[in-house]
Amino acid sequence: MASSSASSVPAPSGSVITIASASASAAANTAACGTGSPCAACKFLRRKCQPDCVFAPYFPPDNPQKFVHVHRVFGASNVTKLLNELHPYQREDAVNSLAYEADMRLRDPVYGCVAIISILQRNLRQLQQDLARAKFELSKYQQAAAAAAAASASTGTNNGPHSMAEFIGNAVPNGAQSFINVGHSAALASVGGAAACFGQEQQFSAVHMLSRSYEGEPIARLGGNGGYEFGYSTSMAGGGHMSGLGALGGAPFLKSGIAGSDERQGAGQ
């Protein structure tokens, strides 16, 4: 049993024209012709319907108005010629198109189906515009996503060396500190002593300049902590307001000398 389906086409007046599918109408018309009932075309033309009638599959006897409209607009001979030039699987669509156009032509003899064609073309243009707008919006989102991906990639590339430098900067001092605390305490002590000597030398230079301003004879001795201690020679005792300093701690002093100048024997032995 053939399946039946139909399609509806709007008309300008507001009515709907229903067009049956090819399989359903052809099967029904073939069954009607098999019972001896002529098709609508042969009945309208008042002729005997033959088994090989070209109109029988497409113009059933229960819908005579379909052939009447087609015959009035296009003519039976023109329709017969057109159907004979087409393949059998194309004839059903051709007959439905002729029937629809003939019905619209009878409703509007001037424009026919032009109004429906204009409506369909306008709908097609609207859909094309909507599609183009949707593609444009989609392209903007795609460009934004690509820009964000590129920015994140560049950020990751720039942060790579910086992160490595931070890792090295955080790791090396801890390791160096542990290394010094465990195995290099002696080296650390020597470095501290050198720094202390450097500080004492700066202090000694400052005091040396101060003592020269008082026209005294500056002498220095090597202290127990590895630095210099400042004092005045015992020969300066009673020789001015600076004579009260005397020798520092009663220890022997080393007289500071200057290259190219005469040394005076004033240090206590």
UniProtKB/Swiss-Prot annotation:
Family designation: Belongs to the LOB domain-containing protein family.
InterPro entries the record matches: LOB
Organism: Oryza sativa subsp. indica (Rice)
Pfam families noted in UniProt: LOB (PF03195)
The protein, known as: LOB domain-containing protein 6
Top-rank lineage group of the source organism: Eukaryota
UniProt KW Acyltransferase keyword: no
Domain LOB: 37-138
The encoding gene: LBD6
Compartmental location: Nucleus
This protein's record includes keyword Nucleus: yes
Alphabetized UniProt keyword annotations: Developmental protein, Nucleus
GO CC entries: nucleus
Described function: Negative regulator of cell proliferation in the adaxial side of leaves. Regulates the formation of a symmetric lamina and the establishment of venation.
Main location class: nucleus
